[in-house]
């Protein structure tokens, strides 16, 4: 195995160890792929230690925490990215090329769907640890489907078309009884060129 891998018992231990090393010998990036409510603390500690961060979306579960991270990144000038992984897929890049080349004409309407079957049942009661935190407002934030899945569609819309969203109306609803967060999310967007999505 040619790769030197160092294990740690906690991110605090990792950050303390990495912060002692010269820049060229540190880890390249800290990847934060924890449940949503556990993004802020390790991200902030990495930024403060000068360690670049690539964080799963959503950035945090509160606007205040997100604002704090943005301020820290700007102050410390540490590279920071938020994962919108579908943008790197070849189909996204091909779609972007086709749409932006003008081959299809002006963008007037964009339709996007992202269907996940696990939200149709109470997967959180069936032993799915991932489902448990994704539908818990304390751990997931203010939205399940919209915040977790809708963000992919909106980011893809901007990436492929090159257009910005001028106005957005969102409708979140919960079909599964007893669930605290949305399991259905619909948006209507007005785009910067007058098109709709």
PLM regions with names:
Residues 79, 86-178:
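Predominantly a Rossmann-like dinucleotide-binding segment in NAD(P)-dependent oxidoreductases
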Residues 38, 58, 81-87:
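Rossmann-like NAD(P)(H) cofactor-binding subdomain of soluble oxidoreductases
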Residues 180-184:
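A short, glycine/Asx- and small/polar-enriched loop/turn
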Residues 5-72:
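Beta-loop-alpha module in the N-terminal Rossmann-like domain of NAD(P)-dependent dehydrogenases
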């Amino acid at each position: 195995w040619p790769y030197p891998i160092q294990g740690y018992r906690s991110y605090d231990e990792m950050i303390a160890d990495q912060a002692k090393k010269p820049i060229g010998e540190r880890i390249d990036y800290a990847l934060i792929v924890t449940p949503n409510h556990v993004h802020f603390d390790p991200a902030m500690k990495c930024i403060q230690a000068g360690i670049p961060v690539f964080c799963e979306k959503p950035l945090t579960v509160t606007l205040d925490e997100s604002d704090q991270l943005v301020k820290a990144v700007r102050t410390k000038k540490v590279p920071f990215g938020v994962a919108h992984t579908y943008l790197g897929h070849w189909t996204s890049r091909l779609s972007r090329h086709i749409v932006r080349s003008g081959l299809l004409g002006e963008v007037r309407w964009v339709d996007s769907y992202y269907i996940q079957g696990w939200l149709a049942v109470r997967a959180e009661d069936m032993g799915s640890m991932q489902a448990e935190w994704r539908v818990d407002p304390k751990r997931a934030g203010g939205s399940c489907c919209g915040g977790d899945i809708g963000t992919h569609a909106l980011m893809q819309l901007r990436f492929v078309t090159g257009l910005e969203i001028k106005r957005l109306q969102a409708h979140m609803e919960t079909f599964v009884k007893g669930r605290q967060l949305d399991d259905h999310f619909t948006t209507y967007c007005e785009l910067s060129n007058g098109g709709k999505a």
